[in-house]
């Protein structure tokens, strides 16, 4: 159950924000500001409290579709659109912050970026991140989107762009639509295949990451010396 922190009595959320800053407000108060109004029978703070109590974490709010938002009592079409826009804006701010650091320093850094990009996609997406000698991103490219006939990309598709971009290294990332990030036998076989192909061309495969909505698996972190 989501934990609610009660607001300070005597001050409305907007007044608290003006006097003390947004960072001191509870999630309930911030949500109440976004919702703006309640209903005839329920205050906006009470509505925000009820919505949050129905969630296991604040992240659940970002996963609700427009239709699911509208099914929440008191949340009509306009409020659901405003909430969806707020969530999308928050995602884009997070992505912009991550993008400021052009140099890739860790698998976790890439995983955070890619969980936002493809972690909740209903189809499998395979993304290649091409890097220069300083591990700076040259280009991030979606190489493959899963379909009925195929569920994984071929190394040649990934390495074609690596050669074209003159990348010295790359990171391969794909999502599991199930949300689970543990590798399947096919994932392991594919990683072996792409690693051999990279070695043949003198390109370093820095990692293969599998991401879900809120978790990831790194072949480099989980397998000693990246030996598969």
Curated annotation (Swiss-Prot):
Q: Which cysteines are joined by disulfide bonds?
A: none
Name the residues that bind Zn(2+): 174, 176, 187
Matching entries from PROSITE patterns are given as: MPN, UPF0758
Please give the superkingdom of this protein's source.
Bacteria
> Which residue ranges does the record assign to the MPN domain?
103-225
Please name the GO terms that the record assigns under molecular function: metal ion binding; metallopeptidase activity
The record places the motif (JAMM motif) at 174-187
Keywords, ordered alphabetically = Hydrolase, Metal-binding, Metalloprotease, Protease, Zinc
Per the record, the GO terms for biological process are:
proteolysis
Q: Which NCBIfam families match?
A: PRK00024.1, radc
Instruction: Spell out the family assignment given in the record's similarity comment.
Output: Belongs to the UPF0758 family.
Please give the name of this protein: UPF0758 protein str1465
